[in-house]
Amino acid sequence: MKPFVKTFPGFVRLIITPATVMNLNSDKKLKVQALWDTGATNIMISKRVANVLSLKKTGEISIQSFAGEKSVNEYYLRLLLAGGFTKDLQVLEFSEIKGADILIGMDIIGYGDFIFTLKKERNISKAQIYFMSPSKGITNPLA
């Protein structure tokens, strides 16, 4: 598998990249915007993604978030990222994810090496992320 590297102009507050999600029962695919969140435990999808892919609810689970405890729907789907990362997994539904369709948490990030760096070259700042799975134990391939 190849590493996934994305460069952003300037300083970034939100790491948002393209991804694809797929219904495991129908092979229906959807291109989405993915928000990477190292503070999140699990991958989450918006209600819109669940509806567009016609995902079947497999259960409900209680989660704890900054807004308190709540019960959310559980689904299974396939996640495809640039560089060849593909994983069938349990996802949780959240009513809305600001600026993105899915939230990638540590359950995905933990499958590989994830590096975020901010560089300044010729007085121009640029941010980069690097994701490689399986992990190669690389400390900074972007240096």
Where are these regions (language model features)?
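Pepsin/retropepsin-fold aspartyl endopeptidases
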Residues: 1-143
